[in-house]
Amino acid sequence: NIQIICCKHTPACCT
């Protein structure tokens, strides 16, 4: 999922 990858680069994206 794109969210998982985004979380790796930007934690704020994970929330």
Curated annotation (Swiss-Prot):
GO cellular component: extracellular region
Tissue-wise expression: Expressed by the venom duct. Is mostly present in part 5 of the venom duct (distal part near the pharynx), and less abundantly present in part 4 of the venom duct.
Highest taxon in the source lineage: Eukaryota
GO molecular function, one term: toxin activity
Positions of post-translational Threonine amide modification: 15
Keywords for the protein's UniProt record, in alphabetical order: Amidation, Disulfide bond, Neurotoxin, Secreted, Toxin
Compartments, record wording: Secreted
Keyword Disulfide bond assigned: yes
Modification note: Contains 2 disulfide bonds. Contains 2 disulfide bonds that can be either 'C1-C3, C2-C4' or 'C1-C4, C2-C3', since these disulfide connectivities have been observed for conotoxins with cysteine framework V (for examples, see AC P0DQQ7 and AC P81755)..
UniProt similarity note: Belongs to the conotoxin T superfamily.
Domain notes: The cysteine framework is V (CC-CC).
Protein name per UniProt: Conotoxin tx5d
Organism listed in the record: Conus textile
